[in-house]
């Protein structure tokens, strides 16, 4: 159990299973009575693809890597980017982190477009300047083979953009009204980037740009020479564009974040009636974007219930589906996470692409990153959901990897998925079974997450709240008697614990004292005997390790005072 502690309160950082070459913090437990592996070939999802490397392209920035996960167990093949580098020694491949996946099915190929996380392990923000794409086809879905085209486009392709903030985008194909003839097709890439003029004016710089290409691999060029939409026009941070063309030919662009989802129709050609991919509908003045605010069917909020960001809208039959990052605490029945710095994938439905939206439920539970950013599409005769996690080796909330899993449908049109974004189990045995325990705490600050103490990650720098547990309160400190408990379904035999404490410049500090207790067979908590000592050293380089007489128990408690 690793703790990140602070002035007048205690916070704990990621902990868990020690295995392979990665040190994952947690309660150090004796090797007896280990919990069974939770991921097996029978209960874990299996999705992958066959390498496709035949598209014509002429893009000098592109680097191509072949990914072959076919030798891995089936349940480890679906994290496309998470396992990249396992079978390919290329350093660029091993160190490549991808996020914000959006999928496109075109000409028998599956394209998963992503952003590129370049943040260092201790950097507490996004560093994103370009986009890439994973490509496969239907023939080898279970082989785990992909072709990764890196840097198919850069944010600085827009002369009006700063070259930074290459966040989540989407590529759509325009068949120019001739679906049987692909020779005249164009591709449009809707991406959020930072606008130079807005930034110079001290405004939120994010804007949506649209690029154009004859190939989904590029090269891409600015389609209109200016932002399609800016934050000053929309009055919300203008990110996460999602483009959708309805069966009647009307195009819609959805976007938004921080609980507000907006949409705008695209203009139609007066002669042909075809939707424009580069012009939005305006109000009667001819210049003001005609924005539509998405409403929840129950409470008339500024978005579907639980909505945070990353909308993805599509139609199936007569029903419109709105899939998004959601589940923030405070969103009522849509809450599916413990921390407001986490997300799950939820969805709502409507009989209109502009809502109102009726909440339906969760497709994919919360993962290891602060966002998940879904896309959903049909490829062949199956449906899939893409998303990202922070589970790749060396991953953080700003160094992510994309995944893909199957989506199933009930007879009444409800979406379900077997996806559960967790790390694949390590194959080597371990003396540490912290990750198999259920965690409880006497108090957890809202932005923090008690599950971080045994999620299998130890970060050298704690950059956002989900990476630690804290008992900070806005009342006079110190608090006495706060504790964290590991509870197992069966008995374990424990003889040591390793704890990390940390401080910050505000109100967090190490506890005045702490001790380890175990749950006795009679149901009472008892102190472990012969402890080697309870130090309160702070910092990741100085874990506090205590050994004690071995105990057989179903629960261990870290009890803190002061």
Regions found by a protein language model. Name each.
Residues 42-168, 173-236, 245-303, 315-321, ...:
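Beta-rich carbohydrate-recognition and catalytic domains
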Residues 412-468, 503-515, 559-562:
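Juxtadomain low-complexity/linker regions and immediately adjacent membrane-anchoring helices
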């Amino acid at each position: 159990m690793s703790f990140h502690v602070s002035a007048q309160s205690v916070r704990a950082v990621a902990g868990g299973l020690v295995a392979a070459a990665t040190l994952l913090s947690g309660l150090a437990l004796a090797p007896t009575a280990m919990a069974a592996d939770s991921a097996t070939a029978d209960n874990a999802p299996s999705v992958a693809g066959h390498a496709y490397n035949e598209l014509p392209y002429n893009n000098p920035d592109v680097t191509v890597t072949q990914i072959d996960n076919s030798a891995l167990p089936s349940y480890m093949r679906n994290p496309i980017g998470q396992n990249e580098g396992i079978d390919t020694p290329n350093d660029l491949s091993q160190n490549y982190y991808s996020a914000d996946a959006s999928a496109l099915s075109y000409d028998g190929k599956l394209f998963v477009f992503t952003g590129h996380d370049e943040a260092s392990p201790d950097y507490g923000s996004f560093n994103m300047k370009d986009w890439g794409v994973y490509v496969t086809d239907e023939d080898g879905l279970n082989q785990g083979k992909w072709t990764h085209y890196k840097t198919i486009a850069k944010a600085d392709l827009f002369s009006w953009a700063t070259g930074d903030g290459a966040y989540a985008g989407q590529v759509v194909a325009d068949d120019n009204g001739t679906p049987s003839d692909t020779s005249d097709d164009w591709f449009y890439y809707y991406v959020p980037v930072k606008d130079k003029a807005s930034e110079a004016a001290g405004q939120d710089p994010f804007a949506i740009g649209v690029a154009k290409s004859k190939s989904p691999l590029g090269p891409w060029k600015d389609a209109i020479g200016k932002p399609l939409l800016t934050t000053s026009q929309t009055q919300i941070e203008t990110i996460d564009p999602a483009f959708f063309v309805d069966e009647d030919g009307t195009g819609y662009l959805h976007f938004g974040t921080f609980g507000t989802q907006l949409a705008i129709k695209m203009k139609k050609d007066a002669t042909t009636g075809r939707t424009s991919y580069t012009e939005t509908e305006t109000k009667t003045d001819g210049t003001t974007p005609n924005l539509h605010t998405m409403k929840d069917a129950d409470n008339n909020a500024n978005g579907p219930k639980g909505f945070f960001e990353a909308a993805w809208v599509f139609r199936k039959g007569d029903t419109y589906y709105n899939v998004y990052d959601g589940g923030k605490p405070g969103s009522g029945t849509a809450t599916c996470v413990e921390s407001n710095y986490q997300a799950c994938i939820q969805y709502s439905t409507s009989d209109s692409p502009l809502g109102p939206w009726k909440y339906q439920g969760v497709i994919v539970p919360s993962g290891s990153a602060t966002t998940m950013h879904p896309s959903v599409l049909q490829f062949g005769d199956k449906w899939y959901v893409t998303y990202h996690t922070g589970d790749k080796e060396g991953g953080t909330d700003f160094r992510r990897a994309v995944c893909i899993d199957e989506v199933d449908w009930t007879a009444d049109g409800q979406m379900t998925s077997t996806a559960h974004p967790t790390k694949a189990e390590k194959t080597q045995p371990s003396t540490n079974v912290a990750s198999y325990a259920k965690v409880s705490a006497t108090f957890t600050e809202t932005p923090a997450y008690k599950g971080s103490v045994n999620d299998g990650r130890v970060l050298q720098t704690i950059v956002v709240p989900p990476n630690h547990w804290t008992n900070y309160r806005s009342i006079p400190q110190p608090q006495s008697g706060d504790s964290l408990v590991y509870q197992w379904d069966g008995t374990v035999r424990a003889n040591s614990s390793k704890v990390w404490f940390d401080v910050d410049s505000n109100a967090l500090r190490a506890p005045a004292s702490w001790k380890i207790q175990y749950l006795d067979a009679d149901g009472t908590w008892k102190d472990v005997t012969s402890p080697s000592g309870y130090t309160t050293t702070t910092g990741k380089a100085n874990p506090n390790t205590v050994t004690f007489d071995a105990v057989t128990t179903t629960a261990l408690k870290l009890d803190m005072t002061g």
